Amino acid sequence: MRKIVVQEFVSLDGVMQAPGDKEDTDGGFTQGGWVWPYWEDEIDAYMGESMSEVDTCLLGRKTWQNHGAAFEPMPEGDPLGDMMKATPKYVVSTTLTDTSLWRNSTVIRDNVIERVRALKAQPGKNIGIDGSSVLVHALARHDLVDQYNLLVFPLVLGGGKRVFPEGQRMNLRLVESRPFPSGVVLMRYVPMRAEGAE
C-alpha cells in the first residue's frame, strides 16, 4: 500500500500558513514569506529528493490553485516544472469546476476519505501533500497520514494555521532528523500505530 506523506514548512510554534508569500491571508495573517530568510541550496536539494519519492499529489483547492499558477506557466524543459506538470494531481474541492489551470488534475468532490483510501490502495510511489491544512487535518483525524516531513524553521510566528488538528492527541515516532546550516531542521515522523496497523 502506498504512503501518504505530508510535507510542510513549519515554524517552531507549529504554524504552516503562507510560508512562501501572501498566498494565504486567512484570519488576517500578515507574516507570509517567512521561509525566505532561511532558504538555501541544501533545502532545494532536499525538496528535489523528496519529490522523487512521490508520483501523485493530493491537495486542497487553495494550495492547488497557488501551485498551479506557479508551475503550469514554467517553460517546457524546466525540470521542476515538467515534473510537476506530469505528476497526477487530485484536488479536494466542492466548488472547483475547471482544472485547466494545471494539467493532469482531477477533482475529488465527495466521499473524500473513501477516495483517498482507494488512491492509497493503488500501486505506485508515495502520495504527497503540502499546504492544504484542512485536508491534512481531515486525513489525520482518519489516521490516513503515514509520514510527516516537517521542515522546522527557527522562528515563532505567534499565530496562524497549524499543521496538526486542534484537540487530537497523536503519538509520533521520529525516524530522521537532519539539520541545515541556516538553522532549519528536517524532522521526519511516522504515527505510532498498533502493531500490524501500518
Model regions and ranges:
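Enzymes that bind and transform nitrogen-containing heteroaromatic metabolites
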Residues: 1-198
